[in-house]
């Protein structure tokens, strides 16, 4: 991971003075943090916990959960909120990365693993085969470990929309055939803010991906996540939750966006803990089977807990 100091369109915006008092991450034990971080270095792996500076990584490590970042550490997309390095990655994915991830899972005795990836628009399959390969590698050495996937939209490679949709579904099928316990794809924000926040992705394309997952394998629950604090309104948040339910999305996470650096899109609002409780009740009322909502909630937070 690299932290850039170069000026961006956001650099001139004055940062917030201080995080609100309710933004207090659980650090976990220093020994547990060090153990995971050392193993990640030893096996030359990337984790979104570290790359994305997740505020919950100490708590997750302590509970036997970790999120591995596949396909390298450079993303072909340039989302305005994300800490992961942007650019054009090396053409080939490291074929031994799957084995190294499996070794790390075994050594750490992880109970629940989330596999995510940088966007790899440069590859024909957008990294779908690598997801499948890694799931199978983990199952060989840690058969009782549950594996969730958090994927990009697998979109691209064809101008014709009908053909592009067919290709996207074929990539999705590769991942779902490996039978993850949950398929996660994040909307991130409300429809109005998509273009600014998620460059290269679209709101309805993501909804269609979640819908397609349920159509391909309805035994695998689907999940999506939202960040608050980017300028969205309450009614837009509720509409987004309704849109997710309209494609039979069963799980949702709702958390506060925290600006990684001055190079990233600024926080417009820090929502109160009671607001997150409010949206949780609404989501549950809409029929979501599992809702995690709170200022520090992220996509993988308490992912190991079963849905109701």
Curated annotation (Swiss-Prot):
It comes from the Bacteria. It is an enzyme of class 2 (transferase). Binds 2 [4Fe-4S] clusters per subunit. One cluster is coordinated with 3 cysteines and an exchangeable S-adenosyl-L-methionine. Keywords: 4Fe-4S, Cytoplasm, Iron, Iron-sulfur, Metal-binding, S-adenosyl-L-methionine, Transferase. Its cofactor is [4Fe-4S] cluster. InterPro entries: Aldolase_TIM, Elp3/MiaA/NifB-like_rSAM, Lipoyl_synth, rSAM. Residues 61-289 form the Radical SAM core domain. The keyword ATP-binding does not apply. One of its GO terms (molecular function) is 4 iron, 4 sulfur cluster binding. One of its GO terms (cellular component) is cytoplasm. Gene3D superfamilies: Aldolase class I (3.20.20.70). It catalyses: [[Fe-S] cluster scaffold protein carrying a second [4Fe-4S](2+) cluster] + N(6)-octanoyl-L-lysyl-[protein] + 2 oxidized [2Fe-2S]-[ferredoxin] + 2 S-adenosyl-L-methionine + 4 H(+) = [[Fe-S] cluster scaffold protein] + N(6)-[(R)-dihydrolipoyl]-L-lysyl-[protein] + 4 Fe(3+) + 2 hydrogen sulfide + 2 5'-deoxyadenosine + 2 L-methionine + 2 reduced [2Fe-2S]-[ferredoxin]. NCBIfam families: lipA (TIGR00510), PRK05481.1 (NF004019), PRK12928.1 (NF009544). This is Lipoyl synthase 2. It comes from Prochlorococcus marinus (strain SARG / CCMP1375 / SS120). The lineage of its organism: Bacteria, Bacillati, Cyanobacteriota, Cyanophyceae, Synechococcales.
